[in-house]
């Protein structure tokens, strides 16, 4: 896991070297006629899809729906997706429900795009277009570089669809930022994680997918019940469960969500909740000197993954082989 985290910068650089192919796909899709975008993925790929959703909605102003593959596989109900943009994200490209959902979407008249690591896979075969992650083989059960790769590949596609030069510039800076992020030391979290009964990971907007991804890794690698949620949702029911044994990890982006996140962070501090904040002038977790809010949700995964891996080893767990899990998960 540790070595694969360190490979993330090169994975992303390799994706961006394929930019002409991504631009060609964007031109062939013809986004202007799409009534909506549907994003399909499970687990970590689903979290990458949440990040993609916010990019699509804020850059393309296109409403995004999260696909429920069981509508196709269990309920056998094909959806009305004519002219929709359907994006499926998968590391292995082999899960039967994702294959079926992609096949059904294409048959319904959607423009289907597969963001996959395994380009020779059933999901890739069913899609009209393929955007490769270029991550190479991943040996650890826990996905890291493929998650970062799928988020970067999705962002690159949106940048081309939108003709967004600012996003393209941020993506150009991303490999170097990922490389620098490997040196960030988040060890201040370790003690709280080791004694926690549960963990809440919160963010807003573009950071929500990463919050959910970090929570998944806490459950998967540290065997610690964790929930990733919107900082806005944290203020509803979940807030009642906060205590000295339920630390909150919060990610703050330097964008339109910053004011709300700052206010919530201050309130949690007053209530003596164990808060670990990344980003902003009040952030306790080491962060890069400058902000790139459109890609920071990707970069923040690097120090988060590293501290989870390190804490797992300190607790006597094998971060590369969590119990009862396999590298490829096939659902129906």
For each feature predicted by the language model, list its residue ranges.
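Active-site phosphate/pyrophosphate-binding segments
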Residues: 3-35, 129-247, 257, 315-332
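Short, well-ordered loop/turn and helix-capping segments at boundaries between secondary-structure elements
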Residues: 163, 224, 254, 270, ...
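Conserved phosphate/anionic-ligand binding catalytic regions in large, soluble enzymes, centered on
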Residues: 1, 51-52, 211-213, 217, ...
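Glycine-rich phosphate-binding loops that contact phosphosugars or nucleotide phosphates
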Residues: 21, 31-179, 204, 239-240, ...
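Composition- and surface-driven signal marking solvent-exposed, interaction-prone regions
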Residues: 214, 262-264, 300, 323
């Amino acid at each position: 896991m540790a070595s694969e985290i360190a490979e993330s910068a090169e994975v992303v650089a390799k994706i961006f070297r394929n930019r002409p192919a991504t631009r060609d796909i964007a031109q062939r899709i013809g986004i202007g006629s799409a009534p909506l975008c549907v994003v399909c993925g499970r687990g970590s790929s689903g979290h990458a899809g949440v990040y993609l959703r916010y990019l699509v909605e804020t850059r393309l102003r296109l409403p995004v729906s999260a696909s429920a593959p069981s509508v196709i596989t269990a309920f056998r109900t094909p959806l009305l997706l004519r002219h929709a943009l359907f994006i499926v994200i998968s590391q292995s490209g082999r899960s039967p429900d994702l294959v079926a959902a992609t096949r059904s979407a294409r048959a319904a008249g959607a423009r289907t795009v597969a963001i996959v690591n395994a380009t020779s896979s059933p999901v890739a075969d069913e899609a009209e277009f393929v955007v490769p992650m270029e991550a190479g083989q991943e040996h650890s059960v826990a996905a890291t570089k493929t998650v970062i790769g799928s988020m970067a590949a999705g962002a690159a596609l949106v940048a081309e669809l939108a003709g967004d030069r600012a996003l393209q510039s941020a993506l150009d800076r991303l490999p170097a930022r990922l490389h620098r992020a490997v040196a960030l030391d988040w060890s201040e979290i370790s003690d709280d994680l080791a004694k926690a009964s549960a963990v809440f990971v919160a963010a807003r907007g573009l950071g929500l997918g990463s919050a959910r991804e970090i929570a998944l890794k806490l459950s998967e690698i540290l065997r610690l019940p964790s929930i990733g949620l919107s900082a806005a949702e944290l203020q509803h029911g979940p807030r009642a469960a906060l205590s000295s044994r339920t630390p909150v990890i919060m990610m703050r982006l330097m964008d339109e969500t910053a004011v709300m996140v700052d206010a919530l962070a201050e309130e949690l501090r007053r209530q003596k909740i164990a808060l670990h904040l990344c980003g902003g002038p009040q952030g306790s977790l080491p962060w890069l000197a400058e902000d790139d809010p459109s890609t920071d949700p990707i970069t923040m995964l690097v120090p988060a993954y590293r501290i989870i891996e390190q804490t797992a080893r300190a607790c006597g767990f094998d971060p590369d082989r969590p119990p009862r899990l396999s590298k490829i998960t096939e659902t129906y």
